[in-house]
Amino acid sequence: MTPPEERQMLRETVASLVAKHAGPAAVRAAMASDRGYDESLWRLLCEQVGAAALVIPEELGGAGGELADAAIVVQELGRALVPSPLLGTTLAELALLAAAKPDAQALTELAQGSAIGALVLDPDYVVNGDIADIVVAATSGQLTRWTRFSAQPVATMDPTRRLARLQSEETEPLCPDPGIADTAAILLAAEQIGAAERCLQLTVEYAKSRVQFGRPIGSFQALKHRMADLYVTIAAARAVVADACHAPTPTNAATARLAASEALSTAAAEGIQLHGGIAITWEHDMHLYFKRAHGSAQLLESPREVLRRLESEVWESP
């Protein structure tokens, strides 16, 4: 298990890199780039942090970390809406590692950041799909590697996360699916928590500086209560996601996904309302968080599908 002090150091290192290289202007530049992410920042994350090697065992050239370590990095990237291939790459690595004999060469390339990975849960909406080199699909309880495939970018609500429609041309079976969709849900939930925390921070800062009726709007009791409620919602969701990272069961994954989706959607909606008209100007970041909230809530599975699955799991429990 990674010691808490090392995990905190990891968080601080990633946060420092993001603060230095992924400000609002840099995020917008990455959104508009050919590959949809900042390649120089990606190299820094791989070389200085080992972000793409965290979940790979040391004997295969990785850092030998845990799911919680990857979640910390994803959370910090989500906080700043950093366009990054880390989520898809990490999931592809975990899928490859599930095989009886993992492809060491592919894992090395992914760990170094020289190859980009993608996991196919829904072939119509694949994260990193248009830039992926290594693709693994999870269908009908099996993991399959797509050795040849075609990719077509699709329109998205969230400009900070590109998706693509993939079609397989040649495949090879890997192994039974150990539940990679649950892992994907947990990592996405961690990303949502980071974004929700930043939404609250932006809203509190604005409420302290925006003056109306001769006083900052944040001093009004009604707004204080709304922001306090939002803080509690995010803190509770953060705890649920942390628990899922340490015990990634299907029920915990579904619960984390629902809690994080609710936290981010609520934080983004409150942020839009409390900022007022400035929140929907292109120059402000809040509208990007709003789009990320709604795009992420529907990614992988819709909240309704997660609730339906969670309901069946709960009722089947002894």
UniProtKB/Swiss-Prot annotation:
- Pathway listed for it? Steroid metabolism; cholesterol degradation
Species: Mycobacterium tuberculosis (strain ATCC 25618 / H37Rv)
Needs which cofactor?
FAD
Write one Pfam family the protein is assigned to. Answer: Acyl-CoA_dh_N
Write down how the cofactor binds this protein: Binds 2 FAD per heterotetramer.
Swiss-Prot/TrEMBL keywords: Cholesterol metabolism, FAD, Flavoprotein, Lipid metabolism, Oxidoreductase, Steroid metabolism, Sterol metabolism
Q: Supply the InterPro entries for this chain.
A: AcylCo_DH-like_C, AcylCo_DH/oxidase_C, AcylCoA_DH/ox_N, AcylCoA_DH/ox_N_sf, AcylCoA_DH/oxidase_NM_dom_sf
In Swiss-Prot or TrEMBL terms, this protein is called: Acyl-CoA dehydrogenase IpdE2
Gene that this sequence comes from = ipdE2
Q: Which residues does the annotation say bind FAD?
A: R210, G277
